From Swiss-Prot:
Keywords: Transcription, Transcription regulation
Name of the protein in question: Transcription factor xenB
Tree of life domain: Eukaryota
UniProt key word Transcription regulation: yes
Residue span of region Disordered: 220-249
Functional note: Transcription factor; part of the gene cluster that mediates the biosynthesis of xenoacremones such as xenoacremone A, a compound that shows inhibitory activity toward the PI3K/AKT signaling pathway and which has the ability to induce apoptosis of A549 lung cancer cells. Acts as a positive regulator of the xenoacremones biosynthesis gene cluster.
Record field: compositional bias (Polar residues): 229-240
Disruption phenotype: Abolishes the production of xenoacremones A and B.
Amino acid sequence: MGSNLAGTQCLDSLDFVLQGGAIDDEQLRITPPEDCFDVNFDFISPPVPRTMPDFGIYEFGSEATSGSLEPGPFMPIEHAATSNPAAEKPNPGALVHVSSMQQESVEQMSALNVEIHRQLSVVSQVAKEYATTEPSLMDSTDQRNRLSSAVVSMIQGLQTFQTLLLEILGAARQGSPKEPASRASMHSSQKNDTSLQTSWTWLNTKNDLSSIADADTGDTISDFETGDRQTISRSDTNSEVRPIPESPSQTTWLDMSTSLLIISCYINLIQLCRDVFAAIRGALSVPGHQTTLLELSGFQISGVSIHEDSDLQIIVLTQVVVRLIDRIGLYLGYSGTSTAEAGKRDESDFNCKTISPQLLDFVLGQKEMEGQPSCKERIEALREEIRKLSEVVYKPI
């Protein structure tokens, strides 16, 4: 791919920094082991405290969005201060009703789901245009901007969903002595104890978010593209950190409406990722596609600039999305994304018991209905898009 990537302001820089450090076992019980590298994005301005990031979405229905087809950025919404009262041990099988803070997160999750659904119609149209429109008739600048906006929406949507999910699940676990009392304690060790820290600046703004952090030992990379259990291990001198299984007597479930909202948003995110990668692949097939792709002009690894290699930039983008989806699947207790066989949960990998496994299996495992693909089929479609994209951008060694 060529180096003529200019004219867009949507994507600015991406830096990788390798760090070391020990992991506090007590603070990382919530962290899924051996599945992902640590990823830390800088998306939204102004900066916010790491213990309680502010999240929001682009205001749906406003004049700014209703008159434009371009996916809009996710804007910050102020959070109320978080309290940390001691909670009693939950009764077995009890439904967890939302607190005021959790209710705020649920409302933001609902708004996020609406915005993602709107983005789906926009991104699918972009992908369709690349597949059906003659290259000579396409406005390269407009398509580049729309594609870049779609990528921004995809990454921010995944990041926002993950953080809101942690807030909801963290509030639901407050009654368990084994679980951290708040999401602040879930991430208190993430500032200095990341094995791979990534900063990605969008729209010339910075906001340090560290909602993705792994233990420093035994990390693995799962093969999302093939759905296999093949992993690449990293050795370390520290002892392995794994979550402690939760006893059945401490199991509590979120209420039905909150659980269904989370699952719906997750399914829509999978579809959005699939459509974005389909649009990127469509752009790659257009002659002179260097002028129609997204730009990562400041992308660096260890200070070495590779901004002229857009193939490598796309490879990194796919791997970032794979790891985000892997992590979200673990938080949901549904590892059908890559860690386990598609459509199956792997409860031994992560201590997530706040969404009923029967509900997860019923909704995510069901077959195609009324022409709509199942979650398993959507995940497989995303894998297929990444496989096809890899065939275009990967260079044989």
